[in-house]
Every structure is written in C-alpha cells, then in structure tokens.
Amino acid sequence: MNGDNRPVEDAHYTETGFPYAATGSYMDFYGGAAQGPLNYDHAATMHPQDNLYWTMNTNAYKFGFSGSDNASFYGSYDMNDHLSRMSIGRTNWDYHPMVNVADDPENTVARSVQIGDTDEHSEAEECIANEHDPDSPQVSWQDDIDPDTMTYEELVELGEAVGTESRGLSQELIETLPTKKYKFGSIFSRKRAGERCVICQLKYKIGERQMNLPCKHVYHSECISKWLSINKVCPVCNSEVFGEPSIH
C-alpha cells in the first residue's frame, strides 16, 4: 500500500517467443486488430501433442512461413522439415550448422596409392629376405641340384619343370657338330650291330641320324641335341664338347 491507499500492482512480463514488439506483433498477427494475448491461466493443462502444435504454429509465424505471400517460397514440406530438426525447449543458437564433411576424391586416391605402395614395399622386402636366407627351402633345393651327376631323364624333367639354364650349348653350336646316317651291311657295321645309344638305351636302326662328338662318342642326333642343350659335356666321358677334354 502507498500513500494514496491504492494497492500496488506487480508488473509481470510474459515471454511470448515472438520477435516483434508487443503492440505491433499482435496487430500484425490478428490482421490489424489490436488485441492482447489470451489469458490461459484457467485453461487445462496442454497435452504434449497440443503443445507441439502450438509451438509449430508460433515458430512458423516467427520464421516467416505464414501468409499467402510466402506460400510460393515456403511450402508445408519445408516448414515441417525445418521444425523437425528443432527440439522443443531449445533456442536457435543451440543448434550448430550442419557441415557435410566428405572425403576429397584426391585424398581418397592418394590414400589408396599409399596403401598399395606400402603393400608392394612389404612384399619386396619379404622376397629379398627369402633370397638371402640360407635356411630357405628354395635355396636348399637349388644347392642340391648338380646337373653333372643327373641322368638324361632327370635333366629332361628338370628342363621341362624349371626351364633350361644357359649351362648347355646354344642350338647354333649344336648344329655345327657332324652328323651321319646309320648304315648296316658291311663287315664293320655287323660288329657294331648291338650298339645302343647311351642316352635313350635303344639300338641304332638303319637310316637314323647319328651325331659324332669331338671325343669320338656317337649318339642319336635328337638325343644328344637335347642333352647338350642342358649340359655341354659328353654323357660318357664328361668332356666339354667345345672345350678341353677331361682326363680320367
């Protein structure tokens, strides 16, 4: 009570959630008629669905979605999409702008190339380590191979399996060796009737081509050609065909 014996009224301010001034906002909102906000003191408690509907309507007007002039620019889908991203009870500044973080295609390709280079480098290091490892099975297998102690069949199988190595003679050198046809009919040839090719262990037949080595040993031309392409020594005396003869 004051000196005039009149009751002092407390002023209460209500947060309406509208960005406009109180007088202007109500006039614009209700079509130009100045009207105060309705008193909801005696209204029943609003259900969550009703509260959501009221918030959507007020926010729609707040963000400029209402009105016939804005209908062509903002449809109901845009308004609902915008409001669905907002949570009731949170202010606008609580929402951070969404940034679409996408990998740059150039960065993706660079990472793929880097991963590929790392894998290739690891494989290369592993191969080098195996080559220098004396306990490697491959190294042991290669050390156990001695073409000088292998039979013709073993050399042929080895050549077909791993390919011929340049320990033998070239085809041009082999073709320079003298050849002749085997003949049977004379006295001297009868004495050699039981001769066989040491390589294939088959008897010579009339008309078959024979090849004479510098060491005077004779073989089937086909058999000795295959042998010399793998090993350049004579199968009998181990003398090099185009080198110094071995002394036994």
From Swiss-Prot:
Q: Mind listing the GO biological process terms from this record?
A: floral organ development; negative regulation of cell population proliferation; negative regulation of organ growth; positive regulation of leaf senescence; protein autoubiquitination; protein ubiquitination
For this protein, the record's Pfam families field holds: zf-RING_2
Q: Does the keyword GTP-binding apply?
A: no
Q: Which stretches does the record call RING-type zinc fingers?
A: 197-238
Record's superkingdom?
A: Eukaryota
> Which Gene3D superfamilies does this entry report, sorted A to Z?
Zinc/RING finger domain, C3HC4 (zinc finger)
Function comment: E3 ubiquitin-protein ligase that limits organ size, and possibly seed size, in a dose-dependent manner. Negatively regulates the duration of cell proliferation in leaves and petals independently of the major phytohormones (e.g. auxin, cytokinin, gibberellin, brassinosteroids, ethylene, abscisic acid, jasmonic acid), probably by targeting growth stimulators for degradation. Limits the proliferation of root meristematic cells. Polyubiquitinates DA1. Involved in the promotion of leaf senescence, in addition to its function in restricting plant growth.
The name this protein carries in UniProt is: E3 ubiquitin-protein ligase BIG BROTHER
Give the species. Answer: Arabidopsis thaliana
Q: What is the lineage of its organism?
A: Eukaryota, Viridiplantae, Streptophyta, Embryophyta, Tracheophyta
Name the gene: BB
